[in-house]
């Protein structure tokens, strides 16, 4: 598994509490059957990534996922429609 710090937005401070929140958020998704998933932390926004063929399943569980993510402190819960991909936090940094 990739380092949890790779899920944190650039410029955001990394704390044990923040890493714990990300770990718990991903555990929630895994417990719902999403073996491959990432929660990218953008402060108050949690961006969920799952493989493209599992996106519909996230939408089906939307209410449960939102409730769990809000309980972890996320105000906004989003689903990345591009699906799971390694290194997605680097995409913004690579832009000219």
List where the protein language model places each region.
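Nucleotide-activated chemistry modules centered on ATP-dependent adenylation/adenylyltransferase
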Residues: 1-96
């Amino acid at each position: 598994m990739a380092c949890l710090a790779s899920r944190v937005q650039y410029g955001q401070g990394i704390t044990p509490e923040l890493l714990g929140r990300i770990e718990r958020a991903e555990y929630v998704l895994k417990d719902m059957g999403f073996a491959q998933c990432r929660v990218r932390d953008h402060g108050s926004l949690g961006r969920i990534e799952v493989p493209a063929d599992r996106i519909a399943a996230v939408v089906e569980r939307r209410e449960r996922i939102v409730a769990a993510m809000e309980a972890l402190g996320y105000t906004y819960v989003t689903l990345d429609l591009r699906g799971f991909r390694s290194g997605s936090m680097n995409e913004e940094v690579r832009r000219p």
